[in-house]
Amino acid sequence: MKKIGTVYLVGAGPGAEDLITLRALSLLKSADVVIYDNLSSAFLLFECRKDCEKIFAGKIAGHKCNSQDEINALLCQKAKDGKMVVRLKGGDPFVFGRGGEEAAALEREGVPYCVVPGVTSAISAAESEGIPVTHRNLARSFRVITAHGASCLSEAYFSQFAKNEEETLVFLMGVSSLENISKGLIAGGMKSNTPCSIVESGTTIKSRRIDATLETLVLRAKEKCVSSPAVVVVGKTAALNFKSSAFSLSGKKIGITGTSQIVEKQRKAFFETGAQILSGAFMKIDINEKAMQDVFSCGFSCVDWIFFTSSSAVNLFFDAFETSEYDLRSLFDVKFAVVGGETAKTLRKRGFKADFVPENANSESLSKEFVQKFGKSAKNVIALRADGGSKEMNAVFEAENIPFKDFCIYRTKADIDLLSLFAKSSEVLDFVAFSSSSAVRAFFDYCRETKIEGLKESAKAVCIGKATFETCAKEIGEKRCVLAKNCTAESMVDAVLQNSF
């Protein structure tokens, strides 16, 4: 008899991809099937296994959608097929998420299930824009109310909480019901000058706050073209704004592009500055098997120096080395030159210390400073790097008549689905960080092909490497491009700081 699988009713959090819980993320990475609703952060779905079956069960206005009974039946069926099922819901599954109905259906069918709490937007969306739902001497409690179907609610319904001035009211799914909320609360006895705030797309890169009073709530929403998803906060705490401006990049919105490793390093560096970050890890590494075979076919007995221009090149080379006919003794007489400190750290983890690191961490300095230090005494140099890199290194070695071979052992290509998610949010960015020409081309080509607006005219691009800068300048002009001094996350942050004001 086939073993019944388990269904996990999982909260995805309010929208920001890094506000999902560790337990939820672990389950998402292990699931056989993910049945998901409309998510503010669709990036989460890319955490799933490649063979995971992903089924959309959300509701889109004007489109036919699954009924709750159909969703319940689907959950039960997938579990009875022996699958590990994650039912992924925005926010928390038991806060207006029909998680209770699904749990009851699973209970009736004898299907094992587990509830994994999520961060609810009822608190976090307001909080992300500086609004506490409770505050001493202002609000002793808060009430979370679904505004879905508010047009059917009577004045008597609103009157039960309209007169409590020490309570914060939080309405979810309330954009289409703002007029009913406003009129109902005022009719129930709430003062028309009561502070209100609408938080649109809270915790995400598109988050914005629109302040009003109960009387002006509808007008302000129309003026600002408010759209879902949004949380409506009513009460004294809606007048507060606990959002620090002490950080160096407070209020700035930064998009970071590249491979997942590059994006994560830069994200950490920018996070410390108080910037809002849109992660764009849409570039994937594709190893060039032929070039890698050529490296090993040549052998290492006649190689004096190996140049690495990225951590990716280091890892790809040593991964291939482990499965080759060679062992580490083959490299006993080889020296290593790397582009910068981060690449040197990666090399150290592989058991080798870099013999040369340029003062300025970029490909041009790597070759020029190397020649200045070693001159023509350097011989038999090979470079292992990405396809499409700067040809400056080739020119430097040719000019000095130093034997040099260039192996493009990998290329980077865009994951269209991830690129699409990034591009659709890019119009709000103040800066976008590019670490390669391929990322620049992928982004701007996609925006042109899909007619997505892309970067606003005031946005600037911060680039690592001269080749990346030149590629970007062709797209948006040199005045809007900034060249980072070195190819490090810290250098990217410095470049943004110097061009922010």
Task: Briefly describe each language-model feature range.
Residues 107-110, 133-135, 187-193, 324-331, ...:
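A short alpha->loop->secondary-structure connector
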Residues 37-50, 116-135, 335-345:
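Short, compositionally biased "basic patch" segments
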Residues 14-15, 52, 61, 67-80, ...:
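Signature of uroporphyrinogen-III synthase
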Residues 7-8, 85, 142, 169, ...:
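Conserved hydrophobic helix-helix packing surfaces used for dimerization/oligomerization
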Residues 90-165, 210, 356-361:
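Class I SAM-dependent methyltransferase SAM-binding "motif I" and its flanking Rossmann-like core
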Residues 1-17, 22-119, 305-313, 332:
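Class I S-adenosyl-L-methionine
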Residues 152-197:
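Conserved anion/nucleotide-ligand pocket segment
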